[in-house]
Amino acid sequence: MLKNLLYKIEKLRSGELEGFEVLKEHIQSLDEFQYQQIVERLKFQIELVEKYKPKVRPAIDPMVSTELGIYRRLDDFEIGKLLDYPECCIKSFVEDVRVAIDREHLKEVEEMKEELKNKGIYAIVLPSGFIPCSLKCEEAIKRGFIGYLTKEEFDKILELEKELKEKIRHWHFGYDEYYEKIILP
């Protein structure tokens, strides 16, 4: 998942990837030091994540996200495509102005809770910053952006998140966690 992002960033930098006009211009305008910082930090994050092989990918290192212009809202559709978000989730985020897990998502949790718990599911987990069209979005689940996790899988996510926090330092005000976690009561 993160390897594909790195690939796209490298192709945008070299001008070899189409369909990302705003982001291509932004990434090509980064000075070499900024660009190398993005690449090196992302490679390090990939290395850490691959050790754990989580069912759900973590949020991207906030410094990388910031340098890529994700928080500048350069072009939400291009950013969603760059991050490999499902089109339905991108549309929901942009058109319905969904910026956090909201009442509709929590209503879905209530509807699914008993069925998931009966299947041994302990928590629903997403990368921080990813707002799906639905917590039931099959494409987001398939791509590793939503996971229904057992307690053991959840504990593995917590271990990964702890290591990411310890080894990839940042000072982003928007989030201090790599995952959004909805523990089923």
Curated annotation (Swiss-Prot):
Highest taxon, organism lineage: Archaea
A Pfam entry, by short name: DUF483
Family under the similarity heading: To M.thermoautotrophicum MTH236.
Official protein name in the record: Uncharacterized protein MJ1106
Organism, as annotated: Methanocaldococcus jannaschii (strain ATCC 43067 / DSM 2661 / JAL-1 / JCM 10045 / NBRC 100440)
Lineage, opening ranks: Archaea, Methanobacteriati, Methanobacteriota, Methanomada group, Methanococci
